[in-house]
């Protein structure tokens, strides 16, 4: 195994956004079994340390590829785009975000579970569509558009978590 391989190469996968999670899970277990530190328990210290480094590297790669948002960020980073550094968003999207946040705040204050659930469903639907669009942009690749859409999805994932928190608080 080669430490310079990207996450996709570690698992023998093509470098693309669309992945079969069941296949990724299978490959993870297969690769992890080859380098698991327990297999090296009776080996010299250097080999045990190397096995631990490999296990850590494989776990990190798996966690990155398993999550759609982190997989998209990683793909863009392989193209030289660091999404976290750039913060520009369209005025239209920022207005939409403000409207969403106001609606969540009002529903949270009123403990309106039905309203929060409706907001959650609408946001999830919109995000599903955006994830499909993101996949096409990443596989094209249209890294500029993909980076913009990924930044929007990062905001929306945070908002979704806020709605989940508000629902938990309202139902408690």
Spans of features found by a protein language model:
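C-terminal accessory/regulatory regions appended to core domains
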Residues: 1-172
């Amino acid at each position: 195994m080669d430490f310079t391989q990207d996450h996709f190469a570690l698992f023998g996968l093509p470098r693309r956004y669309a992945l079969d999670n069941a296949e990724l899970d299978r490959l993870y277990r297969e690769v992890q079994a080859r380098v698991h530190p327990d297999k090296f328990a009776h080996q010299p210290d250097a080999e045990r340390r190397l096995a631990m480094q490999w296990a850590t590297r494989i776990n990190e790669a798996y966690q990155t590829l398993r999550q759609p948002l982190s997989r998209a960020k990683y793909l863009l980073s392989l193209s030289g785009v660091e999404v976290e550094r750039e913060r520009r968003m369209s005025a239209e999207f920022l207005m939409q975000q403000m409207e969403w946040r106001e609606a969540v705040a009002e529903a949270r204050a009123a403990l309106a579970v039905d309203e929060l659930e409706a907001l959650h469903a609408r946001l999830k639907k919109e995000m599903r569509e955006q994830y499909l669009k993101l996949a096409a942009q990443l596989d094209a690749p249209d890294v500029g558009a993909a980076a913009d859409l990924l930044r929007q999805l990062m905001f929306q994932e945070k908002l979704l978590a806020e709605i989940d928190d508000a629902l938990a608080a309202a139902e408690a």
